[in-house]
């Protein structure tokens, strides 16, 4: 849903509904996906599984309780999307340098991958060991945060098979 759908003086609602129907018709449901979700906290893994089930995408995601230091993948290219702890509690704050250092080490072991990270931790780049290619200020609720984008190389284009 988009707020602009309610702007009746700009656009007739029927146009919005037609656009939504067209977008749904264009969804390619046969795309092969390899989505993996990890968290050290088992309760967070269960929560993520419940959210995926509610969204109807549970069958496309492999969930596992795992430490970021154990992040490995044999695929040459991929994406890491993460929202690690921000250090809002004092005991977490003390652990952040080591956590972000570990995130950086795990990311570097995946040579050709990209990483997208949301955090309010202002020293994230320092401890990851790399300056982000892009950094956008965002808000996660009321918490001023940053969306760091660490870009890996683009994979080579695949040739389209002749029909």
Explain the meaning of each model-derived region.
Residues 1-72, 88-89, 95:
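Conserved S-adenosyl-L-methionine
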Residues 67-70, 74-163:
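C-terminal catalytic and target-recognition region of SAM-dependent MTase-like enzymes
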């Amino acid at each position: 849903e988009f707020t602009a759908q309610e702007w009746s003086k700009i656009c007739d609602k029927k146009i919005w509904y037609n656009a939504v129907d067209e977008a749904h018709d264009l969804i390619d449901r046969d795309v092969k996906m390899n989505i993996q979700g990890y968290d050290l906290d088992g309760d967070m893994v269960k929560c993520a599984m419940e959210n995926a089930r509610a969204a109807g995408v549970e069958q496309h995601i492999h969930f596992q309780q795992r430490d970021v230091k154990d992040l490995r993948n044999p695929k040459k290219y991929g994406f890491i999307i993460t929202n690690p702890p921000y250090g809002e509690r004092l005991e977490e704050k003390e652990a952040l340098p080591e956590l972000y250092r570990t995130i950086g080490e795990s990311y570097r072991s995946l040579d050709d991958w990209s990483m997208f990270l949301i955090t309010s931790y202002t020293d994230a780049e320092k401890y990851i060991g790399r300056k982000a290619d892009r950094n956008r200020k965002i808000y996660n609720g009321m918490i001023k945060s940053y969306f760091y984008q660490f870009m890996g190389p683009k994979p080579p284009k695949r040739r389209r098979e002749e029909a």
